[in-house]
Amino acid sequence: MASGKAAGKTDAPTPVIKLGGPKPPKVGSSGNVSWFQAIKAKKLNSPPPKFEGSGVPDNENLKPSQQHGYWRRQARFKPGKGGRKPVPDAWYFYYTGTGPAANLNWGDSQDGIVWVAGKGADTKFRSNQGTRDSDKFDQYPLRFSDGGPDGNFRWDFIPLNRGRSGRSTAASSAASSRAPSREVSRGRRSGSEDDLIARAARIIQDQQKKGSRITKAKADEMAHRRYCKRTIPPNYKVDQVFGPRTKGKEGNFGDDKMNEEGIKDGRVTAMLNLVPSSHACLFGSRVTPRLQPDGLHLKFEFTTVVPRDDPQFDNYVKICDQCVDGVGTRPKDDEPRPKSRSSSRPATRGNSPAPRQQRPKKEKKPKKQDDEVDKALTSDEERNNAQLEFDDEPKVINWGDSALGENEL
């Protein structure tokens, strides 16, 4: 499949990928946990959350009059040396009349409860949405169309197309976010460091580990099927599958680092979310057929628009600057660094430091067995922690409502 920028102006509207994801089911459930993922305090003893908007997670299945409920504090603990240790609280959303505080009316005062309601909500209505059965349904990603919680809270990135086997995927993608501003109320801005972008590759890698194994025969088939249907298997270089990288013509995407690492390079994972699907490419492109001596050549010209107010706009621009016509180059921070020396003079017998005296080794105390540590948690705490599916500290980008966060891989 050929691709490229439009050669000239056209009256046809520019094709744009419509981003979307799964939503909570319309019918209630007999479970006992929240439909949505938690928001988590960044520090211990943080005050209750305040929301820039209504505080009600987006759910198009409910009428505006039904968009109200409460956020409930969930104390969290983790096992450690000497017993359990508290970690920052998590807050879960439940619709009015459901969940642990189902007996409360909207607005009733209770410690650890924050009531929220959307515009036009009828707070006298008690929801029949029910709660989630964790054996049948995964947590649903949080989206706040009118603004999320204040900067004291974060939530983890959940791939919108993950299955039951993908729970640990989101754990590796937990991310901190800055306090939201008016310009970015629909998303969460974060730094653009390359090491954060690189970790995005774990999304695909974890899914591969949890899913079916790719045999050598399968990998070879993936790399050598019809050119327009090829995908890069793990441990393959880009040029092994799609040929050498070039400049100014087809095959011009990817620098030397991306070529060597293949799908392990997190920039691949990010940019795949801007690539059109097969249907979008066929029906949203300008298609140009040409008969050539060797056969029929089809050229697909498609434009994906990343808005300037997208939380990851700067990251995408940076990746394009690095990788378009990037053959023969590497990211600046990927260049090998010279080894530093404490002195410019070569070491001689006269100025060499005296050998250090070896200290006697201390006997290591035997570590507690895992089963002994786990006993530090009560059964109630273990059950509560079972709901906390994504607990890693924020180490990577929270893509939020950005092009990456909304498009299926």
Swiss-Prot record:
Annotated segments matching region RNA-binding: 29-160
CoV N CTD domain boundaries: 215-331
Any one cellular-component term (Gene Ontology): viral nucleocapsid
Biased composition range(s): Basic residues: 70-84, 358-367
Modified residues (Phosphothreonine): 378
Compartment list: Virion; Host endoplasmic reticulum-Golgi intermediate compartment; Host Golgi apparatus
Disulfide linkage: 320-323
Annotated region described as Dimerization, given as residue ranges: 226-333
Post-translational modification Phosphoserine, affected residues: 190, 192, 379
Post-translational modification note: ADP-ribosylated. The ADP-ribosylation is retained in the virion during infection.
Family (UniProt): Belongs to the gammacoronavirus nucleocapsid protein family.
Subunit structure: Homooligomer. Both monomeric and oligomeric forms interact with RNA. Interacts with protein M. Interacts with NSP3; this interaction serves to tether the genome to the newly translated replicase-transcriptase complex at a very early stage of infection.
Protein name (record): Nucleoprotein
Organism of derivation: Avian infectious bronchitis virus (strain H52)
